[in-house]
From Swiss-Prot:
Summary of the function given for this chain in its UniProt record: Catalyzes the interconversion of 2-phosphoglycerate and 3-phosphoglycerate.
Residues that hold substrate according to the record: 9-16, 22-23, 61, 88-91, 99, 115-116, 184-185
Biological process according to GO: gluconeogenesis; glycolytic process
HAMAP family per UniProt: PGAM_GpmA
Protein name: 2,3-bisphosphoglycerate-dependent phosphoglycerate mutase
One MF annotation (Gene Ontology) recorded for this entry: phosphoglycerate mutase activity
Source organism of the structure: Xanthomonas axonopodis pv. citri (strain 306)
Entry keywords, A to Z: Gluconeogenesis, Glycolysis, Isomerase
Cell wall biogenesis/degradation is among the record's keywords: no
PANTHER family: PHOSPHOGLYCERATE MUTASE
Subunit structure: Homodimer.
Length: 249
C-alpha cells in the first residue's frame, strides 16, 4: 500500500518579502503568501488528494497557510495538530536582520554557512533577550532548557524527529494521508531524514514557499517517489529565488 505525505512550506511572509531572518518570530503572511496558500490547495485538489489529518507549527504563517489550503480543498474539518517541534529553525542573534545587509557585512559565504550548512549555528540569542522563546507564553509548559537560543539544521532535525516518530509516522503506517505545513528548515530536516541526504548535499537544498511536495512511501515509510505538484520549472525557479536571498545586493 502506498502512503502519501505532503510537505508544504508556508506562503510568503512579511519578513520573506523584507528579506529578513525570521526563525521563531511570529510574522504574518503577505497578500501573496495568502494567495500561495490558496494556490497550494488548488494544486492538491487537482491531484485528488484526500487528507486524513494535518500538522503544523505554532507560528501563524504556517497555521494560516494550512487554513487557506484546507479551505480551497474543502477539507477545513480535518483534525489539525500544532507543535513547536515543527517551528522554523531558530536563527539566534540573526533574527530580524536583513539577509543582504548581513551578507555585505559578514560575506556571502559566511551567511550561506549560517543559512544552509548542516551543523553550524548562527550566533546565539541571549536568554535575557525579550525575543528568546523562554519569554513567550506559547512555550510556557516546556522545559526552559529545551528552548533554543540558536539552532543549526542538525539540532533542528533532533527537535523535529521525535514528532515525526511519535505523531506523523504512526498515522502514515495506519494508512492515513498526511499534510504537514511548516517552514523551510523544519521541512529541510524532514526531507534530509526521508531521503537520507548527506550533510554536504543538504547545503544546496532550498524549499520554495507555497508549493506542495508530495512523497509516496511504502509500508515501512521508505520513499518510493517525491515531486513538487504543478509546474516543475516554476518550483525550480522558486527554489532558486530562496537560494538568492542570502546574497549581498
Amino acid at each position: 500500500m502506498t502512503r502519501k505525505l505532503v510537505l508544504l512550506r508556508h506562503g510568503q511572509s512579511q519578513w520573506n518579502l523584507d528579506n529578513r531572518f525570521t526563525g521563531w518570530v511570529d510574522v504574518e503572511l503577505t497578500d501573496q503568501g495568502r494567495q500561495e496558500a490558496v494556490a497550494a490547495g488548488r494544486l492538491m485538489k487537482d491531484e485528488g488528494l484526500q487528507f486524513d489529518v494535518a500538522h503544523t507549527s505554532v507560528l501563524k504563517r504556517a497555521i494560516h497557510t494550512l487554513q487557506g489550503a484546507l479551505k480551497e480543498l474543502d477539507q477545513d474539518w480535518l483534525p489539525v495538530s500544532k507543535s513547536w517541534r515543527l517551528n522554523e529553525r531558530h536563527y539566534g542573534g540573526l533574527q530580524g536582520l536583513d539577509k543582504a545587509e548581513t551578507a555585505a557585512k559578514h560575506g556571502e559565504e559566511q551567511v550561506k554557512i549560517w543559512r544552509r550548512s548542516y551543523d553550524i549555528p548562527p550566533p546565539a540569542m541571549d536568554v535575557n533577550d525579550p525575543g528568546h522563546p523562554c519569554h513567550d507564553r506559547r512555550y510556557a509548559t516546556l522545559d526552559r532548557n529545551a528552548l533554543p537560543g540558536t539552532e543549526s539544521l542538525a539540532t533542528t532535525l533532533v527537535r523535529v524527529l521525535p514528532y515525526w516518530h511519535d505523531a506523523i509516522a504512526p498515522q502514515l503506517k495506519a494508512g492515513q494521508t498526511v499534510l504537514v505545513t511548516a517552514h523551510g528548515n523544519s521541512l529541510r530536516a524532514l526531507y534530509k531524514y526521508l531521503n537520507d541526504v548527506s550533510n554536504e548535499q543538504i547545503l544546496e537544498l532550498n524549499i520554495p514557499t507555497g508549493i506542495p511536495l508530495l512523497f509516496e512511501l511504502d509500508d515501512s515509510l521508505q520513499v518510493r517517489s517525491f515531486r513538487y505538484l504543478g509546474d516543475p520549472e516554476a518550483a525550480k525557479r522558486a527554489a532558486e529565488a530562496v537560494a538568492n536571498q542570502g546574497k549581498a545586493k
